[in-house]
């Protein structure tokens, strides 16, 4: 699937190279990106269940379902991203806004198999 704002390589699992992103979820992310009006730098998207982060969990997380993405963003843009994501029905939001600016991110997901809606910090 081709997306307007994202390359397959940035959505693929960094462990296997497989892209298992959910198409309906990505349509929502594309709409959020469009409304935000600034580029999204992806730090993590799809993670195959064998990815070291997922393999260490009792049950694979939202990234393994293809319904989660982590966007490197901070300060005012982080606020805008959360505001727009909520408008578009995102039900899982993880906030990591400590440390160097370039490492801060917002996790967005729509994994209804998990306890949602939720917001948490890392």
Task: Give the residues covered by each predicted segment.
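Generic structural signal for short, solvent-exposed loop/turn connectors between secondary structure elements
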Residues: 1, 14-22, 37-39, 56, ...
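Extracytoplasmic cell-surface/polysaccharide-interacting catalytic and binding patches
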Residues: 1-33, 101, 112, 117, ...
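Short, conserved helix/loop micro-motifs enriched in His/Cys and acidic residues
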Residues: 1-16, 53-69
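Generic detector of short, locally flexible boundary/turn motifs and exposed helical patches
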Residues: 6-8, 33-39, 70-73
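Amphipathic alpha-helical interface surfaces
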Residues: 24-28, 38, 51, 67, ...
């Amino acid at each position: 699937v081709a997306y307007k704002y994202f390359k397959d390589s940035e959505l693929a699992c960094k462990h296997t190279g497989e892209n298992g992103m959910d198409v309906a979820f990505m349509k929502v992310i594309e709409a959020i990106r469009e409304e935000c009006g600034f580029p999204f730098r992806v730090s993590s998207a799809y993670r195959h269940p064998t990815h070291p982060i997922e393999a260490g969990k009792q049950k694979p997380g939202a990234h393994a379902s293809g319904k989660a993405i982590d966007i490197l963003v901070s300060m005012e843009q982080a606020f805008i991203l959360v505001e727009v994501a909520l408008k578009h029905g995102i039900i899982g939001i993880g906030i990591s806004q400590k440390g160097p600016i370039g490492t801060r991110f917002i996790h967005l997901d729509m994994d209804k198999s998990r306890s949602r809606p939720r917001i948490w910090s890392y």
